[in-house]
Amino acid sequence: FDLDGGVLQWRDDAVKPAADMLVSALRVQTRGLSWPVRAPMPFEGSAQLDQTVIGIRGTATDTAAQAELSLGDIPLGRFAPYISSALKPALAGKLNAGGRLEWQAAQGDRPMALQLLSARVDVNELKLGPPRQPLASLKRLLVEDLRVDLVQRSADMGNLTLTQPQMRVQREADGAWMFEPWLVAAPNPAAPATPQPWRVGLAALQLTE
């Protein structure tokens, strides 16, 4: 199976402003297709989001899959409709990432498993607010050996490196911190929801100049 030159249009009206993205140059290649599945099927795919290259390569069956993912440099402004639901000031910077995704279907008493392993997230020239006088900035944010369990809702970082973090910390006379006006107030849900909270772990933190 070989798909070449595909186009995918993504629009999300649930956020304001609406998110509108165009994925082009979509290519998917697979070998050894069969049903029932007799052996892991190798696959490979690539696409472009604006000028950003997205890649995936792995193997899959009807009950399990694993894939190496890669995301080239992409401006954070591309995700502004989603970021603005949590932060009022604009967030600028460039993100690239990679990692291994593993999935296993539920079988018997064993629940479904979906994990991102050995992941790396690299954000450069991070600025919050006006570009010339940002409210906060970071030359580089690097997360290494990131492990995310999407079913168990946990994230463990092997190493977090922050390069040249800059932010003025201030508390107002009324006791409010300077960052409180930056945050968008969460809407009151119609009915209280109690999802399992996320657990986040960090093995090592480095601050560098």
Annotate each predicted stretch with a short phrase.
Residues Q9, L128, D149, M167-R168:
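Extracellular beta-strand scaffolds
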